[in-house]
Regions:
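N-terminal membrane-targeting hydrophobic helices
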Residues: 1-227
Length: 227
């Protein structure tokens, strides 16, 4: 899923659990992808490309069991929950951030082709809805999700505009008929990983900064137990 749309999940988390520091929420919704970028840049996880890249289905997430397997995400979420709920005595924070971490793999399962493993060491079967096999449909679904998160949050018009523009900016990646910079990625998966890293930063900054005046804090609601 486009990085901006993963980032908008933080809007939903903040709406449900307003007492959790938004910086933690923003990092949590992209924790899986941040790890993917690092592991790809170090060659621990593997991405391959077709000789010619015209759209996202010409890029293959061939090996990513540590960042994007279902079991790994469960472990990440559990660790986050233990750290905040048990060690820091913040059970509400722990729950919210565990949900934020888990949201990433749920959204990827809803969009990816079959490239998400069950666990490290288990290469088959792999999971994914197959939506990326129809890239333009995936584009529409992803944008609808991002706008829906904005609508639930009741964000500003500026935030909506940025969500829409960042989605439209990636449109060529979803259609081989629309020219774009995708051809530069052929044979260069590390450039792709770095580009995703940039997209993550841009998406998180956009959501974090443009919604900052509306972020709910624990002061906006009666204080929850353990918060």
């Amino acid at each position: 899923m486009n990085a901006i749309n993963h980032a908008t999940t933080a809007l939903i988390i903040n709406k449900k659990w307003p007492g959790v520091p938004i910086v933690f929420v923003l990092i949590s919704v992209q924790l899986v992808e941040i790890l993917w970028v690092v592991l790809n840049l170090f060659g621990i996880e593997i991405t391959t490309t077709e000789p010619q890249v015209r759209a996202l289905n010409d890029i293959h997430l061939a090996y990513m069991p540590y960042s994007h397997s279902i079991a790994a995400t469960v472990v990440f979420a559990l660790v986050v929950w233990v750290v905040f709920a048990r060690f820091l005595s913040k059970p509400v924070w722990g729950l919210a951030l565990a949900v934020a971490v888990s949201s990433h793999i749920v959204l990827d399962l809803a969009t990816h082709v079959h490239d998400i493993a069950l666990a490290p060491g288990i290469e088959s079967p792999k999971f994914g809805s197959g939506l990326y096999g129809v890239p333009l449909l995936a584009f529409v679904v992803e944008m609808i999700y991002g706008v829906w998160c904005w609508w639930i949050f009741r964000g500003s018009k500026a935030l909506l505009a940025v969500i829409v523009l960042l989605n439209l900016g990636a449109l060529s990646f979803y259609s081989p008929l629309i020219p774009g910079p995708e051809h530069l990625l052929a044979g260069h998966p590390s450039i792709f990983a770095a580009a995703i890293g940039v997209h993550i930063i841009v998406g998180l900054l956009a959501v974090g900064l443009l919604a900052r005046s509306q972020w709910q804090s624990s002061a906006d609601r009666p204080k929850a137990a353990g918060n």
